[in-house]
Amino acid sequence: LGWLDVVPGTTLSVVVGKGGASVSGAVSGNDGGDSSLGGIIFGRGGKKSNKASIVNSAGGDGGVASGGDINIQGGTGQDGQAATNMLTGSGGASFWGGGGRSGATGGVKGKAAGSGGGGAYDIDFSGIAYPSGDGADGIVHIEW
């Protein structure tokens, strides 16, 4: 969150980061894109999940803000465990709300702006590589 002094007619560049793209199978996810306002205030995209082995993965770290008067970090995604518990991780939350939940046959897309997508699991152990949910796109909120 930041406050900028502007003069009517001033132009500021706005970049809205894309959410991390979905992946299928026991692989690491994709990072989210960075958002920025005027090249001054930045919201870095969240980091991908990290596959440690075929049976577990670490949730990705939340994105880090900089350049604002108040810099709020995004939430970390949940770890996934598949050995005996068969739990996949949910996507990390953002300032705007929660991430996507994990799901059988496919993870759920991030719900709130800037949140992560959930992991997928194969409830029938069929060997099908189901897709994770996409991360939600970032946001740049401006009030005049």
For every predicted segment, state its role:
Residues L1-G89:
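Secretome/extracellular-domain signature
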Residues G103-A136:
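C-terminal, surface-exposed recognition/capping segments
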Residues G33-S35, K111, G138:
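Extracytoplasmic/periplasmic beta-strand context in beta-sandwich domains
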Residues D134-W144:
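Short, structured beta-strand segments at or near domain termini in extracellular proteins/domains
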Residues A93-T105:
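A C-terminal functional module that forms or caps the active site or interfaces directly
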